[in-house]
Amino acid sequence: MGFTAQQDALVGSSYEAFKQNLPSNSVLFYTLILEKAPAAKDMFSFLKASGPTHSPQLQAHAEKVFGLTRDAAAQLLAKGEVTLADASLGAVHVQKAVADPHFAVVKEALLKTVQAAVGDKWSEELSTAWGVAYDGLAAAIKKAMS
């Protein structure tokens, strides 16, 4: 079964909820990543000098990650696969030595952040929709890395 219009709508509406409190949700996202993988701090230039609460670039990067996942959902609905609009994403991930386990950490942090953003609207269907969209994005990035 392919990605459905309902899944796309779930990702879209919850992405808007995420953006409504971008500062707090961005800090939460990177805090969750660093709790699971403290060494990942060195992969993000904007986290090297300080933690997630003191980084001016943190919001922009979090919005990009969530926006790319939102775009991945739309692509999965439209054509059943994800292609990267920014071809440099693969090279950047290679340069930062990103490996498979890092994608799993980011996915978990992404799902927990969406859950916090939507509150009682969280559901298994919403989790699945974001998970499938993120997996599509991750697969496209991994393909660009090789």
UniProtKB/Swiss-Prot annotation:
Keywords: Cytoplasm, Heme, Iron, Metal-binding, Nitration, Nitrogen fixation, Nodulation, Nucleus, Oxygen transport, Phosphoprotein, Transport. Disruption phenotype: Normal growth and flowering under non-restrictive nutrient conditions, but classic symptoms of extreme nitrogen limitation under restrictive nutrient conditions, including severely stunted growth, increased root/shoot ratio and delayed flowering. Following inoculation with symbiotic rhizobia, accumulation of free oxygen at the expense of reactive oxygen species (ROS, e.g. The modification Nitrated tyrosine is found at Y30, Y134. It holds the Pfam family Globin. PROSITE patterns: GLOBIN, PLANT_GLOBIN. GO terms for molecular function: heme binding; metal ion binding; oxygen binding; oxygen carrier activity. It comes from the Eukaryota. Belongs to the plant globin family. PANTHER family: LEGHEMOGLOBIN-RELATED, NON-SYMBIOTIC HEMOGLOBIN 2. This is Leghemoglobin 2. It comes from Lotus japonicus.
